[in-house]
C-alpha cells in the first residue's frame, strides 16, 4: 500500500513516508508524559545531581540528533533520491537505513531526560518498538518492492 496523496504518477514512494505520523506519536507520548509528571507520576521526579546529569545527557542527545537529522536530510539531499526513485546508500545512509527516524527518536529521548522523571524512561523502549514495527511494515516493504535485491543487499550490510 502506498500513500498516493503524496505522490505523482511517476513516483513510487511518498516523499515523507510515515515519518510525520511517527514524529507526532513521539511528541504526543512525551507531552503526555510531561503532563503526567505534574500529577500522577510525581513519584518518579528526580532531585539533586541526577537532574543535572539527565539534562546534560539529554542536551548531548538532542545535539547529536540534530546533527544526524542534518546529515540525513540536508546534506544527503534525500528528497532528490526519493523523487528519482534512487536507493540512498551513501553518506550517513551507509551507516544506518533510517537516520531520520533515529534522529527523531534520539531527540525524543533527550526531551524525556529533560523532564527528570524516571517513570518516563519506560517510553524509550515503547517508542523504539513502535518505530521498528511501523517502519518494517511500511517503508521497508515499499523499498523492497521498488528496489528488490538491491535493497535486500543494502539491509544485509
Segments the model singles out, each with a brief description of its role:
Residues 92-106:
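Membrane-interface loop-to-helix entry segments
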Residues 1-90, 105-157:
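Membrane-anchoring alpha-helices and their flanking helix-loop junctions
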Amino acid at each position: 500500500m502506498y500513500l498516493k496523496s503524496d505522490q505523482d504518477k511517476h513516483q513510487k514512494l511518498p516523499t515523507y513516508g510515515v515519518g510525520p505520523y511517527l514524529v507526532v506519536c513521539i511528541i504526543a507520548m512525551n507531552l503526555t508524559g510531561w503532563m503526567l509528571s505534574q500529577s500522577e507520576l510525581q513519584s518518579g521526579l528526580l532531585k539533586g545531581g541526577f537532574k543535572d546529569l539527565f539534562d546534560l545527557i539529554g542536551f548531548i542527545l538532542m545535539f547529536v540528533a540534530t546533527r544526524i537529522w542534518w546529515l540525513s536530510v540536508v546534506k544527503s539531499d534525500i528528497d532528490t533520491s526519493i523523487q528519482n526513485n534512487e536507493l540512498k546508500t551513501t553518506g550517513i545512509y551507509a551507516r544506518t537505513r533510517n537516520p531520520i527516524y533515529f534522529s527523531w527518536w534520539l531527540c525524543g529521548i533527550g526531551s524525556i531526560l529533560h523532564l527528570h522523571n524516571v517513570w518516563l524512561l519506560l517510553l524509550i523502549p515503547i517508542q523504539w518498538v513502535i518505530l521498528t514495527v511501523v517502519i518494517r511494515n511500511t517503508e521497508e516493504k515499499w523499498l523492497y518492492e521498488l528496489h528488490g535485491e538491491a535493497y535486500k543487499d543494502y539491509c544485509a550490510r
